[in-house]
Amino acid sequence: MSYVKIQRSIFQPIEDMIKIGLYRDEQEAISSLVHDQAKNKLEQYHKKIENMENKYHMDFSDFETKIKAASEENFEEWDDYILWESYVKAYQYWSKLI
C-alpha cells in the first residue's frame, strides 16, 4: 500500500468532519470527497459534451468522422473538435473514479 504525506493544515477539515460524525474515519471521508468531486466533474463535462452535441446535431464519434473526412479545414470546427475530444477524455477519466 502507498502512502501520501499530507500537511496537518490540509487534513484538519477532514478530522473536523469526522469529529462531528459526518464520516466514521479518514478513509471514508476522503473516499466520499473524491467520489463527490468525480460526480461533480462528470456533470460538468456531460453538460459541455451536450452543448457540443446540440451545436453540431451529432455525437462526438460522428463529428470526428465528419471533420477528418472533410476536404478543407474549417478552423472553428477543428478548434471545437479539440475541445470536444478533451471533454470526452475528461468525462471518461472521471467516470472511472465512480
What are these regions (language model features)?
Residues 74-98:
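Short, compact, well-ordered microdomains
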Residues 67-71:
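Short, charged/polar, low-complexity loop and linker segments
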Residues 1-66, 92, 96-98:
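Small, basic N-terminal interaction modules of short regulatory proteins
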